[in-house]
Every structure is written in C-alpha cells, then in structure tokens.
Amino acid sequence: MTFGRSGAASVVLNVGGARYSLSRELLKDFPLRRVSRLHGCRSERDVLEVCDDYDRERNEYFFDRHSEAFGFILLYVRGHGKLRFAPRMCELSFYNEMIYWGLEGAHLEYCCQRRLDDRMSDTYTFYSADEPGVLGRDEARPGGAEAAPSRRWLERMRRTFEEPTSSLAAQILASVSVVFVIVSMVVLCASTLPDWRNAAADNRSLDDRSRYSAGPGREPSGIIEAICIGWFTAECIVRFIVSKNKCEFVKRPLNIIDLLAITPYYISVLMTVFTGENSQLQRAGVTLRVLRMMRIFWVIKLARHFIGLQTLGLTLKRCYREMVMLLVFICVAMAIFSALSQLLEHGLDLETSNKDFTSIPAACWWVIISMTTVGYGDMYPITVPGRILGGVCVVSGIVLLALPITFIYHSFVQCYHELKFRSARYSRSLSTEFLN
C-alpha cells in the first residue's frame, strides 16, 4: 500500500459511524474485495474510487454504508458465524450491502436465500408492469422512433385491460366486465331452477328441440347468454392481441378457464347449424353440460377488480409451503384416527359393531368432520373407547389446524398492505390523469 500516512501500522475503516481498526498486512488478504482493494491504491483518486472519503492524517477511510449490515458481514468473513439477514432490515437492502462489499447471494444461509428469492420475485412482479424504461429502449433502437407510438398504444391498451385501476378508461371497462360476470352468474344459477327449466323446455318443444341445448334459444336467457358470451369473447381476443407474451398469456389459469367456458357455447351452436338436429348434442350432452358449468369459474375474474380476492390469491401463492405442511398434518392424523376408529367401532366386536365404521375410508369422513369441528352428526362412535378417541381427534384437529395459521395470517397482512400500496399508486396516477 503506497498511498497513506507513512509509518502507520494500521488503518481505520469508518462504516456508517462505526470504526474498525485493521493492520496493513491483514488488509492485503482481507476476504472482502472492496476492503482488500485499498491495499493496492497508489493515489488519492484510486482511494476515492473504493471509499467515499479519506482522512490522510488519521489514516481513516470512510464508507457511507449501513453499519449494522457491515457488522454482520464482518463477523461472517472472520469465521464467527453464518451469514443471515440483519434484523429489522429489508432483504434487498442487505443484499445490496453484500454486493457492495463483494459477497454474493450464495454466501447466505439456505433459509435466507429462499427469503431473498421470494422477495426478489415479488418485487419483480410488483414493478415489472410499471417499468418506465421499456419504451425508451425501444425508441433508441434503429427504427424504434417510428414504432414507438404503436408500442405506446399497445401498452396503454394492455394496461387498460389487465390493470383495472391504471386509468379512468380501465375502471370503466372493469365495471362493465363485472356487470357481465354478475349477469352471467345469475342466469347460470337461475337456469338450474325447476320452474326455469320447465319453461325453457316448453319453449323448445315448439321447435322439436331436445331437452338440453346450449345454443342461443329464443327464450330471453338464451339472448342474455349470447350477449355475455360475445362480450367475454371480444375481451379475450383483445387481451390476447395486446399481450406482450402470447405463450405466457395462453398458459395463465384465468385465460384457460375463459377458453373452457366459452368453447362449449360455440361448439353447440356449430353442431346445431351444420347438422340441423340435436342428436349429436344428446350424445355429447353430459360433456357439454360439464364444460358449460365451467362458466361458474368466471367469478374468479372478479379477482382482477377486488383487492380482497387478489390478497387471497397472493397469500395462497406465497404460503404454499405452509399449505402443504397443513395438508400433511391432516393426512397423517386422518390415517391414524381412521384406522383406530374403525378398529374400535367395528373390528373388535362384530356382533355389536358400528355399521358406519365398516372400513377405514368410511371412517376418514368422520375424522375430517371431527378434526375441523364441523360434526354433521351423520356418523358417530357408540363405544366408550371410540368416544374417547373422538375427543382426542377433535382436540388434535384444533391444535394441528392452528399451527400454520400464524404464518398464513402474517403473509395475508403483508400481501394486503402491498396491494393497498399498489392501488394507492394507481389512484394517484388516475387522479392526475383526471385533472389533466
């Protein structure tokens, strides 16, 4: 180290106000790359490329960084522990400190690596739709200036259809879509009423039509159904055209549900038009009815417009490990209690056996409703050991179901605040657009 106060045996690192004294020899082979680079500095300019400031008289180097994070990193490189996130510090901020000092994500403990991956994935999802530099990069390419207006128009259309709170037009479009979803659900539910079915059958009998037809009949419900299907079809086509990644669009669960819900209507119409009769429809009637009932999943489309459903979906996505753990708990307990209950109620004394517990699969139903404290009362133990086992089953169900609830609750609160923050940002942009 040729730069610095001559004769000084040590140097001082001042990181965010915390001072650390290191010998020159230790500085040469220090594990942190940024610190070890100080040993090769030959001028003040070289030093200021490594640190933020330098005091030649005291031989002190200043780093305007997070002192607590550096303390954790310093303990790790000195071999006094494993590298974990500092308490009360954002994972991304701590990772930024690691990159600054020359460490990588692989140096973190596995649990912290998972936390970092989850946070980076959530942050990417949160900000990817609001990336401001995409259009600028397109304009910088050859021919990008001419194509930029069309790209801006497509991006504006995409946000209008995909982000209901991004603009005033998006909110109006979302409101219309919600109305169509509600009307479609009401018609679908009403069509299963006996009086509704009888009236529809009487109308169809005038044209010698079958009892089931998915086509647009002359009754008002058929007209309403055709209008709703037309709206959803147009919406799906426009969203596909303006989407950035067509393959990713097709793979989305909501879009798959849209396709499965729309297709049966057009299949039935085409079969009626080309065959002129409904014999083919009768053969495929069960399949079409099942697919037609897929329209009930259109209610999930409301998740695009209501923050509560979005919070629920995001919570389930982030807590899939806890959900799997809960499922494993229930399956293990169900296997144990169902086998014991079948043995106590039916397997020991065949003469006075309980006919409801004839097999372990039959006992599984009783275990599930007991662990969840529902208790329909359709089957219950009659022997003393069986009733004792039932009490243990109920208590264990309460305990097992309560274990992962804390993690899921905290994740739900975090997801709710994140989505509220995003909604507030869009509301501010919407207010600006309305005022302008």
Swiss-Prot record:
Pfam families: BTB_2, Ion_trans. Keywords: Cell membrane, Cytoplasm, Ion channel, Ion transport, Membrane, Potassium, Potassium channel, Potassium transport, Transmembrane, Transmembrane helix, Transport, Voltage-gated channel. InterPro entries: BTB/POZ_dom (IPR000210), Ion_trans_dom (IPR005821), K_chnl_volt-dep_Kv (IPR003968), K_chnl_volt-dep_Kv5/Kv9 (IPR003971), SKP1/BTB/POZ_sf (IPR011333), T1-type_BTB (IPR003131), VG_K_chnl (IPR028325), Volt_channel_dom_sf (IPR027359). Disulfide bonds: none annotated. Residues 191-220, 275-284, 343-360, 381-387 are extracellular. Expressed in the brain, liver, testis, small intestine, colon, thymus and adrenal gland. Residues 1-168, 243-253, 306-320, 417-436 are cytoplasmic. GO terms for cellular component: endoplasmic reticulum; membrane; plasma membrane; voltage-gated potassium channel complex. One of its GO terms (molecular function) is voltage-gated potassium channel activity. SUPFAM superfamilies: POZ domain (SSF54695), Voltage-gated potassium channels (SSF81324). Belongs to the potassium channel family. G (TC 1.A.1.2) subfamily. Kv6.3/KCNG3 sub-subfamily. Regulatory subunit of the voltage-gated potassium (Kv) channel which, when coassembled with KCNB1, modulates the kinetics parameters of the heterotetrameric channel namely the inactivation and deactivation rate. Potassium channel subunit that does not form functional channels by itself. Reduces the deactivation rate. Moderately accelerates activation. Heterotetramer with KCNB1. Does not form homomultimers. This is Voltage-gated potassium channel regulatory subunit KCNG3.
